[in-house]
């Protein structure tokens, strides 16, 4: 069954303790320190050259790759960035679009598979967090996605992504069952870790309240994610034509250790920049 279909309707309920604001703050700090994208209003408008203005607008674009329901995308927009959100689930994007309508933000949303990313211009920054990259189950899928990211990055542009480690799947969540009850819905999340393939299977069973009634609808979804090592990820980045700027433990913001569960990689486009 395709992931993030029925689950999209209750996704934000079960993710309500996710520190999106902390992520947005940290990503903004990284963009300011290492990137080239500027916030709307921070860009000097003294140039009268149309070409310069077009290039400047491309440089300042920020893409949220695997944006889901757009919570992080909205927060980055509120910080002043010109945002694009890409996700392969139309159901998730429908919720993101409803948030855009409520907030009045100018975010562009595109329904695309990140493995077939297609944009209308180059962009200054790509961010992909909340383990979106782990949904790529084969090495060649990661490499191709990273090559596409690099292809659309403005010279010197920044790619910031996170990923769940093999350690997290093997030692923390693999073969565990999690259950939660909420007023509107309940869920059972069963994990099955396949050691040889390093793939974690999520079987989700969700009971969601139907409208204003006391009736609940049951639906299920199965998700698959693959664990990667830091060495593998750095290899994918380099083969895609980018250089690694920084790697950090996503929880401590310090150098990763063997027990790191989620890792940030900050990479930069270098070939177009050098050329």
Residue ranges and their predicted role:
Residues 160-234:
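SAM-dependent methyltransferase
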Residues 129-131:
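Residues lining the SAM
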Residues 143-155:
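A short glycine-rich, Lys/Arg-flanked "PGG" loop and its adjoining helix->strand segment in the class I
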Residues 224-275:
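C-terminal lobe and adjacent flexible extensions of AdoMet/dcAdoMet transferase-like proteins
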Residues 118-125:
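A short acidic, Gly/Pro-enriched loop at the edge of an enzyme's catalytic core
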Residues 63, 70-116:
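Class I SAM-dependent methyltransferase SAM/SAH-binding core
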Residues 1-66:
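Conserved class I S-adenosyl-L-methionine
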């Amino acid at each position: 069954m395709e992931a993030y279909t029925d689950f999209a309707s209750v996704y934000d309920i079960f993710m309500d303790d996710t520190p999106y604001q902390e992520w947005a703050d940290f990503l903004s700090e990284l963009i300011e320190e290492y990137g080239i994208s500027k916030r709307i209003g921070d860009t000097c408008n003294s140039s009268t050259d149309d070409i310069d203005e077009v290039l400047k607008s491309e440089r300042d674009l920020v893409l949220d790759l695997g944006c889901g329901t757009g919570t992080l995308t909205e927060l980055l927009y509120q910080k002043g960035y010109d945002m694009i959100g890409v996700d392969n689930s139309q159901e998730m994007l429908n919720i993101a679009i409803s948030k855009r309508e409520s907030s009045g933000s100018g975010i562009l949303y595109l329904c695309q598979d990140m493995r077939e990313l297609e944009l209308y211009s180059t962009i200054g920054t790509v961010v992909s967090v909340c383990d979106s990259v782990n949904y790529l189950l084969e090495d060649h899928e990661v490499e191709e996605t990273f090559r596409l990211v690099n292809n659309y990055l403005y010279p010197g542009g920044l790619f910031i992504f996170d990923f769940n480690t093999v350690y997290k799947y093997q030692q923390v969540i693999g073969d565990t069952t999690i259950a939660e009850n909420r007023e509107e819905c309940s869920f059972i999340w069963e994990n099955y870790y396949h050691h040889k393939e390093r793939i974690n299977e999520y079987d989700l069973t969700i009971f969601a309240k139907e409208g204003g009634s006391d009736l609940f609808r049951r639906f299920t979804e199965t998700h698959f994610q693959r664990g990667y090592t830091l060495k593998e990820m750095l290899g994918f980045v380099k083969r895609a034509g980018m250089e690694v700027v920084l790697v950090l433990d996503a929880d401590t913001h310090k150098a990763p250790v063997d027990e790191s569960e989620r890792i940030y990689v900050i990479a930069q486009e270098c070939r177009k920049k050098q050329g």
